[in-house]
Amino acid sequence: MIIKKTILMTLFLLTSFFAAANIKLPHIIASRMVLQQKSECTLWGKADPNEQIKITASWGQTAQTTALQNGTWSVKISTPEYGGPYYIDFAGKNVLRISDVLIGEVWLVSGQTNMEIPMVGWPPYDTIQGGAQALAAADNDNIRFVMLQQKASFDLEEDNNCWWTKATPENCKPFSAMAYFYAKKLYEETGIPIGVIQCCWNGCNTESWIDLETVKTVPTLRNAVAEYERCKPLQKQLEDWVKSHKTITLNSDWRKRYDGVDFFDKEAARLSYADENWKEMELPCYMDNREGIGSFDGIVWFRKWVDIPIEWVGKKLILSLGPIDDMDITYVNGEKIGETLGDGKWNHSREYEIPAETVLSNEMVIAIRVIDCGNGGGLCGVKEALCIYPEGEEDKAINIAGKWKYLPTAEYKDGVFYSYDLKTREYYNRPEVPVVLNMKTISAAYNAMINPVKNYTICGVLVSMGESNVGRSTEYLKLFPALATSWRTAFKNPDMKFYFSQIAPYPYQAGESQCMREAQRRCQALIPNSGMVSVLDFGNRYGFHYAQKQQAAERFAAWALNDVYGKKCEVSGPEFSQMIIKGDKVFLIFSHVEGGLVCKGKHLTNFQVVDAKGVAYDAEAEINGNVISVWAQDCKSPKNVRYAYKDWVDDVTFYNGAGFPASSFTTEKKLIDTAEY
């Protein structure tokens, strides 16, 4: 589920050049970058101790500094009003020049998959509405972006392997669709060059993006902090052990990364391979935290002997495996029968044909190489989806869920696969660490992704996260403001704009998305200089990811255009502000009513009234000017109102005249982490 555009030769030359020089710059300070206009921007890097460094910018600014004893240096340089391109010279014992630098507006975008999904989407399920047309026209030298490498660390890191690029149809393919549409809208409205720092990681927990000292202020995470600090030295031992193994070389073309790759484990596919010493796992399941494997990213083989009816011998069969997170190459009796490779296929069901000539007896062995690059991993559907049957005779299917043999043969860390010896089952010698380092570990993404760029001057941030924290909504009232505090401290900008979107409706197993949306709604009042985007009307019943990235991006842009760029406009849907109860009716007053309150449908939907015992009744509602009256025939003494307060909402009709939907809300004061109302 990770997309990276790899330009290996360019990167090799770039890093080699810097490595050979006395002056060294972090990856984010490079040609094609965008610097924040009319600001005191920080430039920094490394040099020899006590080396004198002079910075000369072609817009007429200079600065001088001396490297400290540890070789680090930094300077402030004034930037003019937007324009360019410019160059900057760094002169010490050697001279470096970075060129094609624009002055404009810089935004950092961060979050989970809805912010990360690229312009090409993850078809066939996760597509971008209007994406193909927008991508074809995405040729704008004034929109530039840098994608930070997804990485987790226990230690504060100084650099992140990334590079700036310009918006072209090819370059934009792996770039965040939400971020591109946001930058496009800002540029169209202002004419100012836009730079975007993409800092996303699907499946991340919010606490992973917060620095450790700030995490310590969240009471519910104290035990996690203690465990984190205890395991930090153990993690170093594990990383050293993992990285002592040989690496698996992937293809340089990100679209064909895994095609024909040698994983050094093909023997595991053989019919005669001896797997009696492998451990067993019940499938289907996510591999995370299963006994014997824990939270693991990499390659895991699964094998199972299956008995089939004798009359099936010599017939074409269908093997159904359900969805596999992320990718797979599947074999039967040692012959490859199918594969699903590439990004965004983690929730795609697998059905492969077994050729008749492969079905030689009433016994067969199924071997699956699962490639997991993040999050849960494994055969993760329902039991009924794991089956085998003759073509056209699904009613005769034999279920193959249950115990499978398994063995991890490679581990994925920091974008690299490290191979474990298949013959010696080397994985079983892997050092154990109670806290697994990944995108869910407290402070891990902050350390490796935010800390390396915290000196870069930005205008503000866009955030779309919270899905991985569903079920912890009460905690989120402290956790999410802590994120804003952490980043404003890191970027040394206490008033930095902080715009965020709610999670979209989705039928979570626990039925708690409405609680998270309510926590996020309340966070807007807890975070100064923030703005919230409602995507209540973009829910996708079949996945977390919605297709309307352009519309969501333009809702984000409305906040920036109004707050930062002086384009006075509505920024939000109707926002509940006051409740008045008169008899059996409740009257709701709203702010953000530009163009009046609007019903986009035959009538307002999704309203409920709640009595003193907390019992909710479906209610009728009508608009009277900027007030909505709500009532239910079976509730004569209403005490509270809920709007769209359920995990799945698909009939949204409540908007303002500017076209923004209202957020779901409840007037109840207590936020409860449960779906049982």
Regions inferred by a protein language model and the residue ranges of each:
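Catalytic cores of secreted or luminal carbohydrate-active enzymes
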Residues: 237-283, 518-589, 593-605
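An acidic-aromatic loop/edge-strand motif
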Residues: 96-166, 197-286, 360-446
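C-terminal beta-sandwich/jelly-roll accessory domains of carbohydrate-active enzymes
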Residues: 587, 592-677
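Ser/Thr-rich low-complexity repeats and stalk/linker segments
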Residues: 22, 28-105, 376
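Aromatic-lined ligand-binding clefts that engage carbohydrates, nucleic acids, or primary amines
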Residues: 278, 306, 312-334, 366-368
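Beta-strand-rich ligand-recognition modules
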Residues: 60-83, 323, 331-384
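Non-catalytic, glycine-rich low-complexity segments
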Residues: 21-49, 99-109, 116, 282-296, ...
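Short, aromatic- and glycine-rich surface loops/edge beta-strands on solvent-exposed regions
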Residues: 83-93, 365-368, 639-645
